[in-house]
Swiss-Prot record:
Keyword set, alphabetical order: Cell membrane, Membrane, Transmembrane, Transmembrane helix, Transport
Protein name per the record: Probable starch degradation products transport system permease protein AmyD
Pfam families: BPD_transp_1
Family membership noted in the UniProt record: Belongs to the binding-protein-dependent transport system permease family. MalFG subfamily.
InterPro entries linked to this entry: ABC_transporter_permease, MetI-like, MetI-like_sf
The organism of origin for this protein: Thermoanaerobacterium thermosulfurigenes (Clostridium thermosulfurogenes)
Length: 292
């Protein structure tokens, strides 16, 4: 009885400690999520009383070419960001974990862009791409520097550059944590066996930091699909909504066109896409970790 009473008493304290976080999660995330799913099956403009209409909102999305184009654009953007952010982030992590001069300063410098808000970052880079690059182009007659963000292609790579510049430092920190946890004995043993730098990385380092790769891949994937503020402040979908990502398309549908229910239906589709891709990605990468 004494053990049960002690367990019950401790259990109450556990629940008391997690209750604020759990309550916040339910109020801020779970309840709005459920309400949002309900609204996706209604005719609602954000003001009038919602009227249940079943799958009509989802059926209308079949003919919404702009929405599907935004999904394709977002998918291409996500692939580019995943590759660039993880490759560069891992490379920088390998660099700053070596015994080199000013490595702590370099860690700070590489991480700093992550502390800047996405909206502000977009406006800063918009000024750089549009004004600074154009000035340099006029002075040096380098044609490709002019007209940035004026085409779909330059707008796409502008978004990739800005997002990568912001997130590389964050991913670098994740890789650093795993790299520094690798026992130095393993590295020394591989050197004694005659392994070169690439062989050490491929056969010793990478298998041990595979969990970091899983985490970083998931973060970059989800953040790339959910990106909104940089898209709004950098290109705003221009030219002609060809650089419009799925989140910006949802925003414009819900708030600019006052079609809240249709926008919510798009958000549900976006959630399903991210959920399916994330589950597959985590499953495959964890399976790869076991094989390593």
């Amino acid at each position: 009885m004494a053990k049960k009473a002690k367990f019950f008493k401790n259990g109450i304290w556990y629940w008391l400690f997690i209750a604020p976080t759990l309550l916040s999660l339910i109020i801020v995330v779970l309840i709005p999520f459920i309400i949002g799913i309900y609204y996706s099956f209604t005719d609602w403009n954000g003001i009038n009383q919602p009227v249940f209409i079943g799958l009509k909102n989802f059926m209308t999305l079949r003919d919404d070419a702009e929405f599907w184009n935004s999904i394709i654009f977002t998918a291409k953007f996500a692939v580019a960001c995943i590759v660039i952010i993880n490759v560069v982030g891992l490379s920088l992590a390998m660099l700053v974990t070596r015994k080199i001069f000013a490595r702590n300063f370099m860690r700070t410098a590489f991480y700093l862009p992550n502390l800047i808000g996405g909206l502000i970052l977009g406006f800063i880079w918009n000024f750089i791409f549009v004004d600074v690059f154009q000035t340099i182009s006029d002075a040096t007659h380098i044609g490709w520097l002019g007209g940035w963000l004026s085409t779909t292609n330059t707008g796409f790579w502008g978004l990739v550059i800005v997002t990568s510049w912001q997130m590389i430092g964050y991913v670098m920190v994740i890789y650093i944590a795993y790299i520094e946890s690798i026992p130095t004995d393993l590295i020394e043993a591989s050197k004694i066996d005659g392994a070169n730098s690439w062989q050490q990385f491929r056969n010793v380092v990478f298998p041990l930091i595979a969990p970091a790769f899983t985490v970083s891949l998931f973060i970059t994937l989800s953040n790339s699909f959910k990106l909104f503020d940089q898209n709004l402040s950098l290109t705003a979908g221009a030219p002609g909504n060809t650089t419009q990502m799925i989140t910006l398309n949802i925003y414009q549908t819900a708030f600019s066109a006052q079609e809240m229910a249709v926008g919510q239906a798009k958000a549900v589709i976006m959630f399903l896409i991210i959920a399916v891709i994330s589950v597959i990605q985590v499953y495959l990468t964890q399976k790869r970790e076991v094989e390593m």
